[in-house]
Regions:
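Short, structured beta-strand/loop micro-motifs enriched in basic residues and often containing a Trp
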Residues: 1-8
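Short polar catalytic/cofactor-binding loops
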Residues: 8-10, 28-29
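Feature captures the catalytic cores and cofactor-binding loops of soluble hydro-lyases/lyases
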Residues: 30-31, 35-158
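Active-site/ligand-binding-proximal alpha/beta "capping" segment
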Residues: 85-87, 161-172
């Protein structure tokens, strides 16, 4: 099992193999459908981007309300295919990792290979457990989207599996 840190480096990414378990530490940014839509609209309109995503990881997640005394609420993955239409633009912008659940389209897999990125899978239905790996959480963009806003999470040993590696190999 590899332990890796963000921001992701090309060497780290290229050493990962499909199906391999990984523990990720560092910063990840949550973003679901509506945040992806806004990010890609900002790219198309050449607007100022709300954060620098170069070499960063996006987690397809909309955390639930934070319970008193906790860092974050439940934070399980959402279906990655819903982000497929937005993924190529974000990979071109420098995103190097994505975390979610489920298959990616052939087009997204080709773009992952082209941009030497990686797609990670994490455990569906385990949002409360995954929250235990989050050390800090802060809202960074699109507050009006509620749980679909972009949050900056500091994670420690967040459990993942390589779903699509930088060579375009997929577990599916």
């Amino acid at each position: 099992m590899q332990k890796i840190n963000t921001p992701l480096e090309k060497k780290q990414i290229c050493n990962l193999k499909v199906g391999e378990p990984v523990l990720l530490s560092g910063i990840v940014y949550t973003a679901r459908d509506q945040a992806h839509k806004r990010l890609t609209e900002a790219i198309k309109k050449k607007k100022r981007f709300p954060l620098d995503l170069r070499d960063q990881v996006i987690y397809y997640c909309g955390p639930t309300k934070t319970p008193k005394g906790k860092v974050i609420g439940s934070c399980g993955p959402t279906t990655s295919a819903r982000m497929d239409a937005f993924t190529p633009a974000l990979l071109m912008r420098g995103v190097k990792g994505m975390i979610g659940k489920g298959r990616r389209s052939k087009e997204v897999i080709a773009d992952i290979k082209k941009h030497k990125a990686v797609y990670f899978l994490t455990f569906s239905g385990c949002g409360a457990l995954l929250a235990k790996y989050v050390r800090k959480s802060s809202l960074v963009a699109y507050k009006d989207l509620g749980p679909e806003a972009i949050y900056k999470l500091e994670v420690k040993d967040f459990p993942l599996m390589v779903g699509v590696d930088s060579r375009g190999n997929s577990v599916y």
